[in-house]
């Protein structure tokens, strides 16, 4: 059975257009680079690494260090819960859509982080970024009806490979379009990471 055709831009919600995701994944890449380069050498745009590091510390018997990783994971969980709870109440008022309100909130949140002193514990920024990255990941889920992530690139790599094979095997133009869309997301994530690294040097 053929996959449904990807909708044209004019038929999509603004928050589902590809350019929105291009901006959001650049922000997601910046989050990871920011906390890794400037705030303690950890990635806060996703949680896989935190659980791996927690397991490593448990294996070494460092219980205190292991338990620390529950803090960013809990912040990430809280961000998901809130971003599931709020949209229904905000959209019901029909003043502004949740995704629009979230972008304004995210900008204010990151702006406020800029006032955290350089000598403050890095955990403050780590937890704050975990929280907001989780909300972003949960709020922006698809572009042009293609499931996408805006804070990490693992799925984008898988989708590039999968759609490349579909395109080469059958000449499917839709698969080719999806492949290039995911490839664009990877490039933007890498570019924002590299830009943050150079700015911090």
Language model regions located:
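Short, Lys/Arg-rich, polar N-terminal cytosolic tail immediately upstream
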Residues: 1-14
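Single conserved hydrophobic/aromatic residue that forms the stacking wall/gate
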Residues: 190-201
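Helix-to-loop junctions at the C-terminal end of transmembrane segments
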Residues: 82-92
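Pair of pore-lining "gating" transmembrane helices in MFS-fold secondary transporters
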Residues: 20-42
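Cytoplasmic-side transmembrane-helix entry/capping segments in multi-pass membrane proteins
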Residues: 96-103
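Hydrophobic core of transmembrane alpha-helices in multi-pass small-molecule transporters
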Residues: 26, 122-147
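Alpha-helical transmembrane segments in multi-pass membrane proteins
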Residues: 24-28, 71, 75-79, 83, ...
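C-terminal ends and interior cores of transmembrane alpha-helices
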Residues: 109-118
């Amino acid at each position: 059975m053929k996959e449904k055709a990807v909708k044209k831009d004019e038929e999509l919600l603004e928050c589902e257009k590809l350019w929105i995701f291009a901006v959001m994944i650049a922000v997601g890449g910046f989050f990871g680079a920011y906390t890794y380069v400037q705030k303690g050498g950890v990635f806060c745009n996703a949680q896989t690494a935190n659980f791996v590091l927690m397991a490593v510390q448990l294996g070494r018997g460092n219980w205190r260090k292991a338990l620390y990783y529950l803090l960013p994971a809990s912040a990430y969980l809280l961000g998901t819960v809130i971003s599931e709870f709020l949209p229904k109440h905000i959209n019901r008022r029909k003043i502004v859509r949740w995704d629009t309100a979230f972008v304004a909130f995210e900008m204010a949140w990151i702006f406020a982080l800029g006032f955290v002193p350089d000598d403050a514990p890095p955990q403050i920024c780590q937890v704050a970024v975990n929280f907001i990255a989780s909300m972003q990941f949960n709020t922006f889920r698809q572009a042009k009806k293609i499931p996408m992530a805006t804070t990490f690139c693992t799925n984008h790599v898988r989708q590039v490979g999968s759609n490349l094979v579909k395109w080469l095997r059958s000449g499917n133009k839709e698969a080719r379009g999806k492949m290039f869309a995911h490839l664009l997301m990877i490039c933007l994530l890498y570019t924002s990471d590299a830009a943050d690294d150079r700015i911090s040097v």
